[in-house]
């Protein structure tokens, strides 16, 4: 239906958000338990740094990624961008001429923004609950009580929570961008979480 104003869109969006959360198994949202972030392995590249991160998105379930931070010369707060990856063998470490998640995050950091590249379920370091192709295909996986898209979206929500804990981050300027499956994750996060000031899903499910 035609939406004539911002207010009309907010009214239209509310039931869409609710329907999406129900379909994802995220209604009501799970409890936001402590993230217990661990940041290690700092590498200094001159005008930016790269660190390894783990956060506990569910009790006993850990999400891993890399945090790219600019070397700031002032105390001003900066934007922060989530960078979910697509269905590529290398996951968040993909570095090809067609596209590179590390290069994208380095670019953001060099432009004065914090960037967090984190694993899709079953990739790289985030494999403790199985593979994304077979998740919930067996009774043990189903004991988690959440579907794959819901789990991935919850990981994105908690990754956004993590960015909000960083002292240099401007919480009013949070964003998300990704390609392919990362574009789908960007789309879904923006659908259920209104904290994003900007989102750029690329080559995702609707194309």
Region annotations inferred by a language model:
Residues 55-59, 69-71, 86-88, 122, ...:
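Short, flexible loop/turn elements at secondary-structure junctions
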Residues 62-63, 79, 197:
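Glycine-rich phosphate/pyrophosphate-binding loop shared by adenosine-nucleotide-utilizing enzymes
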Residues 74-165, 205:
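Cap/lid segment of the alpha/beta-hydrolase catalytic domain
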